[in-house]
């Protein structure tokens, strides 16, 4: 988030008449509930799936459906007069993690619970073979700027838990009136079942190489 934000900050101070610019700022994808954010069999009841996150009892994080993400990108190019000079922060919903099990149960009929853990506890789920490995496989080498998976994703969770995320929901509704507006709606539309399915190439490549 920091590295991309620095690029966006640099772009945002450019003269938008001499160089028309727009920034599309996203968040985690709802589809990552199939992968990095997928539920696991609960330790107390293997028949129940546990959605695990270090967000506290009522913490939330923004998620966006990839289908709508592409439509927002198309809007940026189709409406240059409105999008010029705009950093459009998009999301489908500010998702309270403790509410996901109820949405999942309603969409699938399956039992689920929310488990709040520490950031270190989240890494103990084994999502990354080595959480302390440097993140950025395409970089030519470690120049002192690369961060570990623990630093990178730990920063994500701490920022979201802080409650400082702000979105212009009215603008997103105006741009895309038929957008997906809740994780429950996305689950029903995508026939989500809680099973792990590949999404991010880099994520699976790293697990294969480990």
Language-model-detected regions and their locations in the chain:
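Surface-exposed beta-strand-to-loop junctions
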Residues: 49-52, 125, 164-167
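Amphipathic terminal alpha-helices
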Residues: 167-210
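Generic structural signal for individual residues within well-ordered alpha-helical segments
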Residues: 70, 101, 123, 184-187
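Oxidoreductase cofactor-interface core, primarily capturing Rossmann-like NAD(P)-dependent enzymes
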Residues: 1-111
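Generic recognition of well-structured, leucine-rich alpha-helical segments
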Residues: 14, 76-80, 107, 153-163, ...
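Surface-exposed polar/charged interaction patches
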Residues: 39, 159-162, 206
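Terminal hydrophobic/aromatic helix or amphipathic segment near a protein terminus
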Residues: 88, 101-161
